[in-house]
Every structure is written in C-alpha cells, then in structure tokens.
Amino acid sequence: MLGLTEAEKIKICLQKQVNSSFSLHNGFGGNLYATEEKRMFELVKPKAGASVLNQSTWIGFGDSRTDQSNSAFPRSADVSAKTADKFRSLSGGSLMLSMFGPPGKVDYLYQGCGKHKVFYEGVNWSPHAAIDCYRKNWTDIKLNFQKSIYELASQSHCMSLVNALDKTIPLQVTKGVAKNCNNSFLKNPALYTQEVKPLEQICGKENLAFFTLPTQFGTYECKLHLVASCYFIYDSKEVYNKRGCGNYFQVIYDSSGKVVGGLDNRVSPYTGNSGDTPTMQCDMLQLKPGRYSVRSSPRFLLMPERSYCFDMKEKGPVTAVQSIWGKGRESDYAVDQACLSTPGCMLIQKQKPYIGEADDHHGDQEMRELLSGLDYEARCISQSGWVNETSPFTEEYLLPPKFGRCPLAAKEESIPKIPDGLLIPTSGTDTTVTKPKSRIFGIDDLIIGLLFVAIVEAGIGGYLLGSRKESGGGVTKESAEKGFEKIGNDIQILRSSTNIAIEKLNDRISHDEQAIRDLTLEIENARSEALLGELGIIRALLVGNISIGLQESLWELASEITNRAGDLAVEVSPGCWIIDNNICDQSCQNFIFKFNETAPVPTIPPLDTKIDLQSDPFYWGSSLGLAITAAISLAALVISGIAICRTK
C-alpha cells in the first residue's frame, strides 16, 4: 500500500465514546469511566419482631396462643400452624405454673431442645389468676423465676421440668394444707406439718429432710438445676411461736454442709412489722446435681419437690415474647422486666393493647405480625428486629443483643460506589505492568464487562482476571502479589487503628450497664468505620483489576483485527488502521472489522455485581480476613457491537 494516494486511504478507528455523562473511577493500577455507578451495598432496615437463624435449631415454649390442640386453633393462635408445630405448649399452662403447681391450675411437662429458645408464655400466672398460698402478689417471684429460666436457657441446648425429685422426709411430719391455698397447697414446695403435743413436747422436733437433684431426667441430661428455695417470713418471733420456743428457720445445705439457701431467724432479724400472718418467699437457686438436706424449725417444713434441669451444653439466643391479657384482665410485666435484665435475651413487645380474634385474649393481629418472622430464617436477629438481606450496613444501630451476621450502622453517603453500566478503561499507570505498554488503549475505547465478586472468610485470596496470553497485556503475577500486599497492609493499618481505639475505650469501662452499652456502641462504630475503609480499598483494587482486564481484552481484540486484515490494513496506532478503499471494499471491511457480520450485535447489559459477606462483619477487624475473587466475562465477538469511525 506504499503507492496509495491520500484520497484512496481510509482510516478506521474504534469510535470515541466517553463524554460528560461518564464518571471517573480511580483504582489501584488502572482507572475506569462508566455510564453508571452504584453503591457496593444498600442500607437495610430491620423488620420488627422475632425470627430465627436456623429453622432446624430452635424450639418454643408457649400456652394457648401457640397450642395446636386448642379447639379454637388457628383463630386462637398468634403464630402460624408451621410455627406452632415448633412450640411445646398447652392451653392454660406456663413454666411457672408447672414449677410450683398451685391447686386447680394446668400442670404441663415443659421440655425440649434447641439452640435458640423462644418463650411465649407467662400470662396464666398473673394478677388475674389470683393465686394466694401465703402470698397475695407473686410478681417479684415470677420476675426472678423468668430471669433465671432465660439465663440458664441461653447456656443450654436442652431443658426439662423435673416433676418428681427423690426425697426423704422425717417421720413426724405429714402433708399439710392451707385455707388460703384452696384448702390444698402447692406441689412445689410441698408443705409438711408437725403436730405438737403441748404436754409431751411444747416446741416439737427440728425437721431434717433430704432431696436429690438427678444428673439425668429421662433422656435429658442435667448439669444444673433451677430450684425454688421457699420459706416463711414472720414479722416477729411471737407470731411464729407464741409458746416461747426457738426462732424460725428453713435452710438448705449441700452435701458438704454449706448453706445454699433459706432463712434463719436465729441469726437474721424478723421484719419488725405488725402483721400476724406469715408470707412465703421463694428464692431461685442454681444448684448442681447431688444430695441436699433441708433443716427447719418445728411445726413447718417446706420441701423442694420439683426443678428445671439444664444441660449447659450450648450457648444460644433467647427470645421472650410479652405475654399479657386483653381488656378486662389484669396483667403483669414480669416477662418484660426479666428479659430486659438478662444478657442475651431479646424481648418482643406490643405497641398496642391486646385485641383478640377468637376472643379478647386470643388471636391478636399485631402479635401475629411480630411473630410472623418465625416462619423464616434471618441472617441477623436483634432487639431492634431481624434482617435477611445480605448488606452489611443498616441506617440505624441495631440494639443488642444480636446474633448472626448483623449489619453495622453507616451513613449512605459513606458506602463506596463501584462502576456500573458501560465501562471504558483509562491508560494504565501500574508500574508493575511492563508489557505491552504500547498496546494499552486510551479512555475512548468501549468495552462491555460482567463482574462477579464474592467476599468469603478465608484470608485474602487471588484474583481471576480472565485469560492472559504471553504476548498480551494485563497484570502479571508480580503485579497481583504487590496489589495484594498493598491491600493487606492497608487493611492491617485500619485494623490496628481500630484495635488501638478499642484499647483506649477499654480504659473507660465502668461497672454500670450504661457505660458498657456506650462502650459497645463505640466499638461497633469503630468496626463500621474500619469495614467501610476496607471496602474502599477493595473497591479501588477491583476498579484497577477491571481496568487492566479490559485493557488486555481490547489489546487482544485489536490483535485479532490486525491478523484478519493481513496486508489489507496497516495499524498506525492502538485501535486505528489505514486501508486501501480500492483494494478492500465494503464487504472486505465487514469481514475484517465486523467479522463478516456473522455475530449478532449484543444487547448491552449492565454491570452485574454481587458481593456476599460470609463472615460476621460485627467481628471484622479481629483475626478474620477477607478473600476476594473477581472474574471478568466478555462477549465473544465484542467487535460486532463497536461503531466504526472512518476518515480519509
């Protein structure tokens, strides 16, 4: 083509595409222009109510509102049939009723296993139940009972009511009853009385009894028992014994003789009030399996005959659902207070009064909505609600306790953006890419890329950059290693700064709960900032990675055109060729530049980006690392979608 005149020469280039509608994205080793951009993650909003992390590893404990055997089910229920099947429930029951067994009340054997335990019960022992038995108001005992249940349940996989403890009682006592207990008494503790004969023995004999907490109850292993240590409280010695006998005492000892519970008015003062009727107090004891003794002053013996047994094998979430009556019945809020004062317990509360569908007390629509999440699996459960989206960020701080892969609080504008839509690489600047410098295209070369990114928990991994021929451009092994070294160093700097900040915060810890909550919030904010910083570094490396990969693909594309042209076209600059219009007509040019039009012009897809966080971002900044794999997929015959610019 040396003899061609200027009129016979035609210059064909890839058309310039970049204009003011493109945005520039800077990265490590290369930059990109893009028609669109999007945030690496969107903010998620938690859904109010309860959910679970795994449908196969949770269990519920309930009453008529979760009881499938109730004659009004499902209208009587606050959960779906699917969820009700996960509950151990009986209408009229509650864990506390089964623990104490007041006369005339439902006595249900609560037992079951699950990593996550959901409690929706308690209303059946409330002021409306009007249970007396030497105590007009049981709310404080209920509060301590529920709190102990939640605490031990959070540390156990299995729990069970033990409704019959082995015991040995003294011969001089017999089962007693009380007028203020429906002329009966509780099943636990059992009341034993001693008849005193004034002529023979004015004061009676001291009572000595024994009970055994088993290591196993049926198929349930027992590492720890919840035992109610009950005793009477007298205002004065005279109220207890008008005959002038000794002081009142009811004390529990372990096998070594150590006092583990009870009251001893021989060393502790009476209340000093003016009442003439005792009240009963019950303390919640956490005791190991073994043989225990009970010593009491004459006349009365309160004997532990039941317990709740826990295997203490697995820590897990606990959810307590507010259990209150509808209109016309008095409720207490012991469940609420117990959960809020127990670490690891998430409380589900209503915002409106209970309004039932089946009756005033069964089938509340608001509660159904709050518990509908139990039908699904969530990535995160917290006091603020549950989340099943994959984003690591939420607009507002999620209140603890929280479990799973919980998002961190962040502002939308702080989340890094990645290029989207049509992508155009700029000239590379990475000094580790040594060849082919002369082959790297400029900003006006158009290409389409599909990106898939997966972030997994395994340490920083390698990049998949597509094919790279020895004669082509792109990133070298040394370049990739240096890129990873840089991102690794930068992330370590971020994490080091975060750890320093946490150490400073540790110095400010006080023993009050608010200070600890404030500290937790500040630590989480530091982790959020560190994660955002890490994502910024990842974004920059990904942009550079895409840019270099696209540059390589463009070089390979130009090489293919040059090879097809042979002597019919001369490459005068990257992406531009001179041809003889007389020798190579339109069909010839179609063969060279449009591959004989055998490939259809593709519909230009947007950048397809997916980022999945497999580790818990709440703990990022510790020993967990990040691994990134990125793959670029290009259309096989991209040239068919590229416009041609002709000049003479």
Swiss-Prot record:
The chain crosses the membrane at residues 624-644. It is found in: Virion membrane; Host cell membrane. InterPro entries: Capsid_hemagglutn (IPR008980), Hemagglutn-estrase_core (IPR007142), Hemagglutn-estrase_hemagglutn (IPR003860), Hemagglutn_influenz_A/B (IPR001364), Hemagglutn_stalk_influenz-C (IPR014831). Residues 1-7 form the signal peptide. GO terms for molecular function: host cell surface receptor binding; sialate 4-O-acetylesterase activity; sialate 9-O-acetylesterase activity. Glycans are attached at N19, N54, N137, N182, N388, N545, N596. Residues 34-151 are annotated as: Esterase domain-1. Residues 303-357 are annotated as: Esterase domain-2. Its EC number is 3.1.1.53. The active site is at S64 (nucleophile), D359 (charge relay system), H362 (charge relay system). Residues 151-303 are annotated as: N-acetyl-9-O-acetylneuraminic acid binding. Keywords: Disulfide bond, Fusion of virus membrane with host endosomal membrane, Fusion of virus membrane with host membrane, Glycoprotein, Hemagglutinin, Host cell membrane, Host membrane, Host-virus interaction, Hydrolase, Membrane, Signal, Transmembrane, Transmembrane helix, Viral attachment to host cell, Viral envelope protein, Viral penetration into host cytoplasm, Virion, Virus endocytosis by host, Virus entry into host cell. One of its GO terms (biological process) is viral budding from plasma membrane. Its main location: virion. Residues 645-648 are cytoplasmic. GO terms for cellular component: host cell plasma membrane; membrane; viral envelope; virion membrane. It is a single-pass type I membrane protein. It catalyses: N-acetyl-9-O-acetylneuraminate + H2O = N-acetylneuraminate + acetate + H(+); N-acetyl-4-O-acetylneuraminate + H2O = N-acetylneuraminate + acetate + H(+). Residues 8-33 are annotated as: Fusion domain-1. Disulfide bonds join C13-C576, C203-C245, C222-C309, C230-C282. Pfam families: Hema_esterase (PF03996), Hema_HEFG (PF02710), Hema_stalk (PF08720). Residues 358-643 are annotated as: Fusion domain-2. Belongs to the influenza viruses hemagglutinin family. Homotrimer of disulfide-linked HEF1-HEF2. Binds to the N-acetyl-9-O-acetylneuraminic acid residues on the cell surface, bringing about the attachment of the virus particle to the cell. Plays a major role in the determination of host range restriction and virulence. Class I viral fusion protein. Responsible for penetration of the virus into the cell cytoplasm by mediating the fusion of the membrane of the endocytosed virus particle with the endosomal membrane. Low pH in endosomes induce an irreversible conformational change in HEF2, releasing the fusion hydrophobic peptide. Several trimers are required to form a competent fusion pore. This is Hemagglutinin-esterase-fusion glycoprotein. It comes from Influenza C virus (strain C/Nara/2/1985). The gene is HE.
